[in-house]
């Protein structure tokens, strides 16, 4: 094998390992964020968010800034019972400059199967969550029943 090929393989391996290690750190970051809600650790949960954070919840009117979401959530955290989301099947994507990462994940929750998606930015060497969208998953064949339930509430 020529030196050019060897060097190319080494660079390729280093790049892939650095992405894996970065992804592992981000997985830990998001896992810890979910765990802090489970343990009702208010400071850790909201400390992971940038001041510009936006949370989209499952109800039509749920679009909260960090402060709004914090005010809504604080009583749950104060009671020691926030929520318990178990994540799996997480997928990551990254900007070319490495300062933005976005993901989607499957969630096992009290609402059964949900999906979350989020965006993180790196500021001053630290990752912060700027956006999270929580959705309840509904099979297509159950959509008609779901729409009928929504109509009943109007």
How should each PLM-predicted stretch be described?
Residues 113-143:
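Short beta-strand edge/turn micro-motifs at domain boundaries
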Residues 1-26:
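Bacterial Sec-dependent N-terminal signal peptides
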Residues 24-40:
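Short N-terminal segments immediately surrounding and downstream of signal-peptide cleavage
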């Amino acid at each position: 094998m020529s030196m050019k090929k060897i060097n190319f393989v080494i660079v390729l391996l280093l790049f892939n390992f650095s992405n894996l290690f970065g992804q592992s750190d981000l997985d830990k970051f998001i896992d810890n964020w979910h765990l802090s809600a489970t343990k009702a650790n208010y400071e850790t949960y909201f400390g992971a968010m940038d001041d510009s954070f936006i949370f989209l919840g499952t109800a039509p009117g749920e679009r909260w800034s960090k402060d709004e979401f914090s005010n809504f959530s604080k009583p749950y955290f104060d009671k020691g019972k926030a929520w318990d989301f178990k994540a799996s099947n997480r997928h990551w994507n990254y900007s070319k400059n490495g300062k933005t990462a976005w993901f989607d994940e499957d969630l096992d929750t009290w609402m059964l199967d949900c999906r979350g998606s989020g965006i993180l930015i790196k500021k001053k060497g630290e990752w912060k969550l700027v956006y999270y969208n929580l959705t309840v998953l509904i099979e297509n064949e159950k959509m008609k029943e779901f729409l009928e339930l929504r109509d009943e509430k109007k």
